[in-house]
Amino acid sequence: MSEFKGIPVSSGSVVERDGVRTIKDGVKRRDDGQGAVRRRKPQWLKARAPGGEGYRSVRGIVHDHHLSTVCEESHCPNLGECWSHGTATFMVLGSVCTRTCRFCSVDTGNPKGRLDPQEPEHCAESVRLMGLRYVVLTSVDRDDLPDGGAEHYAQCVRAIKADNPDTAVEALTPDFRGDEEAVRTVVDSGLEVFAHNVEVVRRLSPQVRDPRAGYEQSLAVLQVAKRLRPGVLTKSSLMVGLGETDAEIDEAFDDLLRAEVDIVTLGQYLQPTRNHLPVERFVSPDEFEALRQEGLRRGFREVVAGPLVRSSYRADRVLEGNNVGLPSVGPDVG
């Protein structure tokens, strides 16, 4: 049984999903019925409930095309807001992850090499139907595939570009086990923004992320992407509220800058279920603004920080000020 600061985070619930046995919500339920204490959320973390015509339209398009969204799979607090505005972040390579990170609620298991050959086409058609000029793709980790799913990921980007030539694409990728050729496959697919998350500060990475992930490996992936395609914007994200210090956040900023990352997002870690890691503290909006200003002072081209900010939250609005080298674009994607 794994522990985080003495709190067990494993044991129980296996379900069948798409013909694959998975651990629901990414971590097993505790046998003793106990879990980490869930802190009461402050008022500034209250999110909009799903509903409205825009929400129903997006839900219909996503489900009709058998697509997964990180909005649903990760229990994103912004789902109601983003879907009501007609946007979503597509999760490719299926909905079952081969890794078990202790902050994440995506189901885990072994997909045994399964891929949906129609997924690139369905992504492209959904982007067209939603009228998006900026779209974010993300994915689960696929350690069961030799290339980590890089070629399928690139096919999705190319299909979107073929049907929607004026649409900018951001790819929020896994680490592909640090494989440079896999990174090259995705970064050469025609995207505008390559994103990969370090997730947490260096000290917490071994306790929070799957053992196959790593802080240094994530930095290397970002650095390789920039080296291979200097004109592509690179982006990463940090969660806060897991016990990190301000000095450790500053260190992470410096590490990301050395990896030539252009854009950083920072958001509050929220515990998906009682079986996931506990929240150590809630960071106030004023503290997030101070972190944003510190990141800008250190040299990032843009920093997006706030309690409900997630990697892909209103991603295109980062570009609206034209300070990152791309023109302003239209409807945003969750």
UniProtKB/Swiss-Prot annotation:
Residues engaged in binding [4Fe-4S] cluster 1: 71, 76, 82, 312
EC number(s) recorded for this UniProt protein: 2.8.1.8
UniProt KW Lipid metabolism keyword: no
Pfam families cross-referenced by the UniProt entry: LIAS_N, Radical_SAM
Covalent S-S links between cysteines: none
Assigned keywords, A-Z: 4Fe-4S, Cytoplasm, Iron, Iron-sulfur, Metal-binding, S-adenosyl-L-methionine, Transferase
Binding-site positions, [4Fe-4S] cluster 2: 97, 101, 104
A cellular component term, taken from the record's GO annotations: cytoplasm
Superkingdom as given in the UniProt entry: Bacteria
Cofactor: [4Fe-4S] cluster
An annotated Gene Ontology molecular function: lipoate synthase activity
Cofactor binding note of this UniProt entry: Binds 2 [4Fe-4S] clusters per subunit. One cluster is coordinated with 3 cysteines and an exchangeable S-adenosyl-L-methionine.
Pathway(s) it belongs to: Protein modification; protein lipoylation via endogenous pathway; protein N(6)-(lipoyl)lysine from octanoyl-[acyl-carrier-protein]: step 2/2
Positions of the Radical SAM core domain: 83-301
HAMAP family, per the entry: Lipoyl_synth (MF_00206)
Entry protein name: Lipoyl synthase
